[in-house]
């Protein structure tokens, strides 16, 4: 999103370090009188909510077996359209060719089996949905070889990436529930964490708490850059290769496209915030 | 893969288009306000906590300390507050505690098992009705509630139909056993079975019959002569103190002799390795007895006071000369003579035998011949001899239950020295031949890979196929899980409780406790049992619901309170290292304790056994004193077992009261000219550690050891691909040509050859059970892992 206004300038000459806080303070206090800013904020909130929804959609695709609703959304064309809208025409076409004449229950079971084969039951096509299996070192550094002369893959669950992910959850005031416990760097949890942060951003924007919204955006970007983005590519490629069902190929494509686009967008936004607050003096750039 | 680039507009469109398609309930909860985010993460950050618990990478339960940093297990080290891992007699423990304890490679590699990416994480339901080796079950994840509801519904239907007894229950034997036994009793099946009959129940039978205790332990540290038949304790560690206690014994001056067809790691550290033909150890022991008695080197007074049947025994061994034994065993008569003299004249001495001679059809009698050597030389329960441990442990919490009167499927009661763990091979055979009292319908398999552990792999697969419904609870998709209708994700030892009270010679109670919560939120096995019991509404004999409000912590707290520690779970947790021990330490010669016989007690003039008026043994009269004696039927060590002599084995053959030598049933012939044996090493347990890369790095293939002379005759060279063939199976293997194995024997390490299980384990080495016949020894029900003959030829 482009900043709503670039016309007003701040003529004060305060130290850069103080500027950002001051600016947001000013915005927070004057915003309600300024329709333009309010509208912009509203639009940002809408985008944040949309992002939260998409993160939730993706999280659910990896965190639990498909539901009947998903099957219906495939059958009635909802997902087809959605895939088309974002330029995944070939996935849409595959999905289209897949569905007709199929009983919803059969289709559901087929997708449950596919989901389990890909993300749950270790086997030849298993794509471990855990960051540590991608980001962590392949081996413990030992040069010992197995007695067939091969180096063994020693990556394990709950590696450093999981610890780092959990730490960021805790910093954001969130803990993984005991009941539906999973290892903290499960793709579903990482995506859902972003859903929470986007939701927070939207809520903060809607209640005029600009600092909180900014904080959430900062956390989103930090989490994406340090946790999700570094492995999402390899994960989605692996899913794309292993998936037999077009739905999961489509979801993998969509995940990768969306996450990378979101990172890019957030980076752009962040640079604008930094520029605006710290450099050009563009008070309304938030 | 095409990666779309999405604009913000498309975000909005996508969100709108997919609204309501899927909504994942939150997997996060807000942290309580009182915990600041920093506070939540900080305290555990740097050094974390050290939590005492017990290893279970094998059944040995060595004491360990786990370092948990940020909710993750970062390091495991030995716990010197627990003697298991350090010593098995108290004086040695107290004296050397400060030197530190040990963990074997498996224990050191335990963290990987906890965090193995190939673990089963969610309950899985089979959707492909076809079952078989390598057939994709087409798993589908289901929720825990669905899984438990479905299993409970199957169990309920069976029970409502009056068929509760057709449920088979299999479990590992050193974890959460009591509560499973309770479940089976309350549910109404007699078919509760455990792993032990795949392990060492013949040894249990041997020592139970000779000295009244089924698991004596050697005080090797204090010994001067250590003689082992078919045991590899320096490598096949169970309790990581084993190697130390033996090498300390050697340092203290013990001479160490190993009789084994294979030059095991242990044999390689011995003063002498004596290669022997498999299953003939009993013959060598009888010849040793012959020499010892002929040369009057036995302990006359001890035998007179503390043994029965000596005269019959000495008459029996009169013609069991070293020359006689040489023909059977392949061990030179002079060697037998020399070992017999050394053993009888060096005091104190230990003689012991484990699974080497223990997994053949003549295991019990052969083993008894070895065990009586201890009685003959007075080397029993004294410092430096084989010891009768004082178990501490926990007591099974009291439960009132009316057990079913239906017979067991395996006919356990017909095995004269059968073990409460049942007879797996008979279960498999009855499912297949239909000759049991009924056909079983359902099985629950806890933490057991039956397919790779019961002799006769194909039979096991076919038997499992015949059951209507199979539940497997395991941390891996094992070859047995591949045959299941439902798989539940198991827990590792770092995620669950256990009370441990054995493996050393004095009463010690130690605790295994979860150091991290189950990492996938899964239920530990005992909670699965509780949940099923609850759903079924199982009631005790008084009609009180047993599982309804049962918490496993309370259950084991009662176990601890009922045992020798007499403290609660919380009190045990608070003790250093979570270990309680009896300050009195190891007691020797416990049979000498004097007892006061009750009014009306009578003495058997022949044996000295003192019995109360109901005929119950209350002591043994030696001289003019009445002692506690041994827990045998006569209260004395038994060269001759009256009780065995009165019974028939499972084949209906009478049993000799003496440890008579008979050859095992299956001997090499022209077609299958080689004995095939197997063994274990420190880096693997059963078939269950083979997905651990740290352990596979040590050994990831079981090449077939073959003597160089034999190999030369067959034109086989080291590293050659070969065929191994028995009447029951044929598979490829790789040859390891060595001088360290008897020329008539080939052998390898057990546990390899997975075709499922995990990506590290899969396809490594050759599975040994496929060559075997599905049989047990006819006295104890011990699975015959080593009674197999093969031919070997170049592939
Ligand atoms: S012997 Fe090794 S695997 Fe077994 S309990 Fe001890 S440390 Fe663990």
Language-model segments: residues:
Chain B
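Glycine/threonine-rich phosphate-binding loop and adjacent beta-strand/alpha-helix elements that clamp
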Residues: 217, 494-518, 528-529, 533-538, ...
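N-terminal export/assembly segments and adjacent metallocofactor-ligating motifs
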Residues: 2-295, 319, 332, 531, ...
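Active-site phosphate/pyrophosphate-binding segments
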Residues: 288, 307-424
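Long, contiguous, secondary-structure-rich segments that constitute the structural scaffold
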Residues: 524-578, 687-705, 709-795
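Extended redox/cofactor-interaction regions of prokaryotic respiratory oxidoreductases
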Residues: 2, 180-246, 252-259, 266, ...
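N-terminal leader/propeptide and maturation segments of large enzyme subunits in energy/redox metabolism
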Residues: 122, 126-146, 297-333, 515-619, ...
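Flexible glycine/proline-enriched surface loops and loop-helix/loop-strand junctions
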Residues: 135, 229-231, 269-270, 319-324, ...
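Flexible, glycine/charged-enriched surface loops at secondary-structure junctions
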Residues: 162-166, 298-303, 350, 381-388, ...
């Amino acid at each position: 999103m482009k900043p709503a206004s670039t016309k007003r300038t701040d003529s004060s000459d305060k130290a850069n370090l103080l500027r950002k806080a001051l600016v947001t303070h000013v915005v927070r206090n004057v915003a309600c009188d300024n329709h333009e800013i309010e509208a912009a904020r509203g639009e940002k909130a809408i985008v944040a909510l949309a992002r939260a929804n998409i993160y939730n959609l993706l999280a659910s695709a990896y965190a639990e077996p498909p539901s009947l609703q998903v099957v219906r959304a495939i059958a009635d064309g909802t997902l087809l359209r959605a895939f088309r809208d974002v330029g995944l025409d070939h996935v849409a076409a595959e999905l289209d060719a897949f569905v007709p004449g199929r009983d919803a229950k059969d289709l559901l079971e087929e997708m449950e089996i596919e989901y389990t084969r890909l993300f749950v039951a270790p086997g030849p096509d298993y794509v471990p949905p855990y960051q540590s299996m991608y980001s962590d070192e392949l081996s413990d550094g030992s040069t010992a070889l197995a007695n067939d002369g091969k180096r063994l893959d020693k990556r394990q669950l709950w590696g450093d990436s999981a610890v780092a992910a959990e730490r960021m959850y805790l910093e954001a005031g969130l803990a993984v529930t005991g009941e539906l416990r999973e290892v903290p760097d499960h793709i579903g949890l990482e995506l859902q964490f972003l859903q929470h942060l986007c939701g927070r951003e939207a809520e903060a924007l809607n209640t005029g708490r600009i600092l909180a919204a900014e904080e959430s955006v900062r956390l989103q970007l930090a989490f994406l850059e340090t946790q999700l983005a570094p492995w999402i590519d390899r994960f989605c490629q692996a899913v794309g290769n292993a998936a037999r069902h077009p739905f999961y190929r489509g979801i993998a494509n969509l995940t990768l496209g969306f996450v990378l686009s979101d990172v890019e967008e957030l980076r752009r936004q962040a640079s604008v915030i930094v520029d605006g607050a710290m450099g050009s003096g563009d008070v309304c750039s938030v | 893969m095409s990666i779309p680039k999405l604009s913000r507009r498309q975000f909005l469109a996508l969100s709108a288009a997919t609204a309501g398609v899927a909504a994942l309930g939150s997997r996060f909860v807000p942290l309580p306000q009182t915990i600041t985010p920093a506070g939540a993460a900080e305290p555990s950050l740097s050094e974390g906590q050290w939590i005492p618990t017990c290893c279970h990478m094998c059944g040995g339960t060595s004491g360990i300390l786990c370092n948990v940093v940020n909710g993750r297990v970062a390091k495991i080290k030995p716990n010197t507050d627990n003697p298991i891992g350090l010593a098995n007699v108290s004086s040695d423990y107290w004296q050397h505690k400060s030197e530190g304890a040990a963990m074997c490679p498996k224990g050191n590699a335990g963290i990987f098992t906890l965090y193995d990416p190939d673990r089963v994480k969610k309950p899985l339901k089979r959707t492909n009705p076809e079952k078989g080796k390598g057939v994709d079950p087409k798993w589908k994840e289901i929720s825990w509630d669905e899984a438990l509801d479905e299993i409970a519904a199957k169990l309920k239907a069976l029970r409502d139909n009056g068929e509760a007894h057709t449920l088979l229950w299999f479990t590992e034997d050193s974890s959460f056993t009591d509560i499973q036994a309770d479940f089976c009793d309350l549910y109404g099946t007699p078919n509760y079975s455990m792993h032990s009959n795949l392990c060492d129940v013949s040894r249990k039978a041997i020592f139970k019959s000779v000295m009244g205790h089924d698991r004596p332990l050697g005080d090797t540290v204090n010994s001067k002569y250590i003689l082992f038949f078919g045991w590899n304790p320096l490598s096949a560690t169970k309790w990581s103190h084993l190697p130390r206690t033996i090498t300390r014994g050697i340092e203290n001056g013990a001479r160490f002799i190993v009789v084994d067809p294979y030059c095991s790691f242990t044999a390689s550290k011995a003063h002498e390795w004596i290669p022997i033909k498999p299953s003939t150890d009993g013959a060598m022991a009888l010849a040793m007895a012959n020499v010892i008695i002929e040369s009057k080197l036995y302990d006359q007074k001890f035998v007179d006071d503390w043994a029965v049947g000596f005269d019959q025994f000495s008459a029996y061994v009169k013609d069991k000369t070293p020359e006689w034994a040489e023909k059977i065993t392949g061990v030179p008569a002079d060697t037998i003579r020399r070992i017999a003299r050394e053993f009888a004249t060096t005091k104190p001495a230990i003689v012991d035998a484990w699974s080497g001679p223990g997994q053949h059809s003549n295991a019990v009698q052969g083993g008894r011949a070895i065990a009586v050597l201890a009685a003959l030389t007075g080397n029993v329960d004294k410092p430096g001899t084989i010891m009768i441990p004082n178990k501490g442990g926990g007591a099974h919490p009291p439960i009132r239950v009316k057990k079913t009167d239906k017979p067991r499927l395996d006919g356990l009661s017909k095995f004269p020295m059968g073990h409460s763990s049942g007879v797996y091979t008979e279960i498999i055979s009855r499912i297949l031949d239909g000759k049991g009292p009924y056909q079983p319908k359902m099985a629950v398999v806890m933490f057991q890979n039956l397919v790779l552990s019961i002799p006769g792999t194909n039979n096991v697969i076919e038997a499992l196929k015949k059951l209507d419904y199979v539940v497997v609870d395991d941390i891996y998709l094992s070859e047995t899980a591949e045959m299941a209708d439902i798989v539940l994700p198991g827990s590792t030892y770092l995620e669950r409780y256990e009370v441990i009270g054995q493996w050393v010679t004095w009463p010690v109670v130690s605790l295994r406790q979860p150091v991290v919560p189950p990492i996938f939120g899964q239920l530990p096995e005992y909670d699965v049992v509780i949940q099923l019991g609850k759903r079924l509404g199982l009631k005790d004999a008084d009609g009180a619901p047993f599982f309804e409000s049962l918490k496993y912590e309370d259950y084991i707290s009662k176990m601890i309170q009922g045992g020798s520690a007499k403290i609660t779970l919380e009190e045990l947790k608070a003790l250093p290292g979570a270990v309680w021990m009896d300050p009195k330490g190891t007691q020797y010669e416990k049979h000498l304790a004097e007892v006061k016989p009750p009014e009306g007690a009578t003495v058997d003039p022949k044996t000295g056994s003192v019995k109360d008026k109901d005929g119950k043994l209350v002591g043994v009269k030696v001289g003019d004193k009445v002692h506690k004696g041994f827990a045998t039927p006569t209260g004395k060590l038994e060269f001759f077992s009256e009780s065995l002599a009165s019974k028939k084995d499972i084949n209906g053959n009478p049993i000799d009261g003496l440890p008579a030598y008979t050859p095992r049933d299956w001997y090499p012939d022209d077609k299958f000219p080689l004995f095939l044996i197997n063994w274990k090493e420190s880096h693997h347990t059963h078939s269950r550690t083979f997905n651990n890369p740290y352990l596979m790095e040590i050994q990831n293939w079981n090449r077939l050891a073959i003597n160089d002379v034999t190999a030369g005759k067959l034109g086989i060279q080291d590293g050659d691909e070969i065929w191994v063939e028995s009447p029951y199976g044929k598979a490829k293997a790789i040859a390891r040509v060595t001088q360290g194995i008897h020329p008539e024997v080939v052998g390898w390490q057990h546990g390899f050859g997975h075709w499922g299980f995990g990506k590290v384990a899969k396809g490594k080495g050759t599975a040994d059970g496929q060559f075997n016949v599905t049989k047990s020894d006819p006295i104890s029900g011990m699975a015959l892992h080593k009674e197999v003959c093969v031919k070997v030829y170049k592939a």
